[in-house]
């Protein structure tokens, strides 16, 4: 068979109950919305025999997953993985109708519990319907860093290892205080978590309402459950390099396998730093077109 993309939808409960009150009957409430996902299968995939390795690639705030397209399927890393026998999955992490009802930019799932639930649902859908290995790799870029990290920390699916490019890891410093996209992620945070507003109509940050979805403050992250590696440029003006460095440093201090590949320049695109590799390991073409794989030559 040739490389193919299977597009699907999964129902996601978007109601966020009060975790601090286990007797609250509202924990039984449901707000079910359909979220979009896709699974890209390699040419080597078969319905029987050896299961294919799945990689969950969490998209950034510059893109989405829709009924007929996604940011991730056009990325070099996805095409390289699929060309070399891996399956790649992603979901939008923010149901389209839910976002429309609350006026949230569809690109900003901000790694919320809704996003985590969607990834978990999509994982089980793919495992149940395709011949895939149950343990997965998780990758993400930018906002996909926080959605991927919160998925890993949920412990809800078996993860082999976690990687990310310039990951968002701190909801306060990187979304609330330094919001990109003209504040769209900050607005999404206010709507999704139900943050209160001050007398000027500005959202008031409240860590207690985030359901543990701020990796920088999540104690589970200090003893990271799987090996993790991040890539980031020191001069990244969208996501704080210092936050990433501290996050990785804390894990290493506690004996975890954590690595940060740092580059002195490159801004918010560490995957584009360096020269094109002429003869990369493995298959380097996707559907007849060469994949642009870079090799960074500078580090700090």
Task: Annotate each predicted stretch with a short phrase.
Residues 237-238, 245-300:
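C-terminal catalytic histidine-bearing segment of alpha/beta-hydrolase fold enzymes
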Residues 149-202:
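Hydrolase active-site cap/lid region
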Residues 108-130:
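Alpha/beta-hydrolase active-site loop
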Residues 140-150:
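Glycine-rich nucleophile elbow surrounding the catalytic serine of serine-hydrolase chemistry
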Residues 1-49:
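N-terminal cap/lid segment of alpha/beta-hydrolase-fold proteins
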């Amino acid at each position: 068979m040739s490389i193919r993309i299977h597009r699907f939808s999964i129902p996601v409960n978007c109601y966020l109950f009060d975790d601090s009150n286990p007797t609250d009957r509202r924990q039984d409430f449901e707000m079910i919305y359909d979220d979009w996902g896709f699974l890209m299968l390699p040419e080597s995939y078969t319905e029987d025999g050896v299961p294919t390795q799945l990689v969950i690639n969490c998209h950034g705030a510059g893109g989405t997953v829709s009924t007929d397209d996604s940011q991730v399927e056009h990325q070099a890393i996805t095409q390289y993985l699929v060309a070399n026998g891996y399956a790649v999955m992603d979901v939008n992490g923010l149901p389209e109708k839910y976002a429309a009802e609350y006026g949230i930019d569809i690109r900003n799932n901000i790694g919320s519990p809704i996003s985590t639930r969607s990834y978990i649902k999509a994982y089980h859908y793919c495992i149940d319907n395709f011949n895939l290995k149950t343990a997965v790799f998780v990758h993400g870029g930018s906002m996909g860093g926080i959605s991927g990290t919160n998925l890993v920390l949920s412990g809800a699916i078996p993860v082999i290892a976690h990687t990310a490019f310039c990951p968002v890891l701190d909801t306060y410093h990187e979304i609330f205080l330094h919001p990109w996209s003209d504040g769209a992620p900050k607005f999404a945070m206010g709507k999704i978590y139900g943050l209160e507003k001050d007398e000027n109509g500005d959202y008031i940050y409240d860590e207690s309402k985030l359901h543990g979805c701020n990796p920088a403050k999540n104690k589970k992250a200090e003893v990271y459950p799987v090996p993790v590696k991040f890539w980031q440029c020191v001069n990244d003006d969208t996501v704080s390099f210092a936050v990433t460095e501290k996050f990785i440093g804390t894990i290493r201090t506690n004996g975890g396998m954590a690595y940060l590949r740092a580059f002195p320049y490159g801004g918010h695109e560490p995957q584009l730093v360096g020269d094109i590799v002429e003869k990369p390991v493995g298959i380097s073409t996707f559907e007849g077109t060469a994949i642009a794989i870079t090799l960074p030559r500078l580090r700090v």
